[in-house]
């Protein structure tokens, strides 16, 4: 299946000059969403994954059905102040400022094999932060899966030491 045909491109959103790749049109098509989920599950099974991790919000949309299909758990990575129990945090730089992501301190057990999922790889900052959180808890990142990779933003450089797959790529 050619998933690219199900991606909507929204010009000049969220700001002028940006061509936003919208995956909601994959999600609202049961066949396309199921296909994407199944492909990531196949990838994960080859890596003997124990738990799936995904950053909010679209990492949840990808990771939860994958975890459910595999009969394993899902651990969310969220913005600061959104998780109710004790958390670990990771602060990282954005173009104009910083951002903080958190994860429950007991979400990952040392030695667990982790798949990180998200909708899209752009600059790599969010996924790099998720990796740091998982590894701080003693997890082993055995794979990272995306629906889309924007190759022209070169986010892969931040995570080049990890096994990464994407179902769709855009060169420009």
Curated annotation (Swiss-Prot):
SUPFAM superfamilies noted in UniProt: PRTase-like (SSF53271)
Keyword Phosphoprotein included in the entry's annotation: no
KW Aminoacyl-tRNA synthetase (keyword) present: no
Keywords: Cytoplasm, Glycosyltransferase, Purine salvage, Transferase
Pathway annotation: Purine metabolism; AMP biosynthesis via salvage pathway; AMP from adenine: step 1/1
Cited InterPro entries: Ade_phspho_trans, PRibTrfase_dom, PRTase-like, UPRTase/APRTase
EC number: 2.4.2.7
GO MF terms held by the record: adenine binding; adenine phosphoribosyltransferase activity; AMP binding
Reactions catalysed according to its record: AMP + diphosphate = 5-phospho-alpha-D-ribose 1-diphosphate + adenine
Enzyme class: transferase
Assembly description: Homodimer.
NCBIfam families reported for this sequence: apt (TIGR01090), PRK02304.1-2 (NF002633), PRK02304.1-3 (NF002634), PRK02304.1-5 (NF002636)
Family per similarity comment: Belongs to the purine/pyrimidine phosphoribosyltransferase family.
Protein name, as recorded: Adenine phosphoribosyltransferase
Gene name for this UniProt entry: apt
């Amino acid at each position: 299946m050619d998933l690219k045909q199900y991606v909507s491109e929204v010009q000049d959103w969220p700001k002028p000059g940006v061509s936003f790749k919208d995956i909601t049109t994959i999600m609202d098509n049961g066949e396309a969403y199921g296909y994407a989920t199944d492909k990531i599950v196949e990838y994960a099974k080859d890596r003997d994954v124990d738990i799936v991790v995904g950053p909010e919000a679209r990492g949840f949309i990808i990771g939860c059905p994958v975890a459910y299909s595999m009969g394993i758990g899902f651990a969310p990575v969220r913005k600061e102040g959104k998780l109710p129990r004790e958390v670990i945090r990771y602060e990282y730089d954005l173009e104009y400022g910083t951002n903080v992501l958190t994860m429950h301190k007991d979400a990952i057990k040392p030695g667990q094999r982790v798949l990180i999922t998200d909708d899209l790889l752009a600059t790599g900052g969010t996924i790099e932060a998720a990796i740091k959180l998982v590894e701080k808890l003693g997890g082993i990142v055995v794979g990272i899966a995306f629906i889309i990779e924007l190759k022209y933003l070169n986010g892969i450089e931040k995570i080049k030491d990890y096994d990464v797959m994407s179902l769709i790529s855009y060169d420009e």
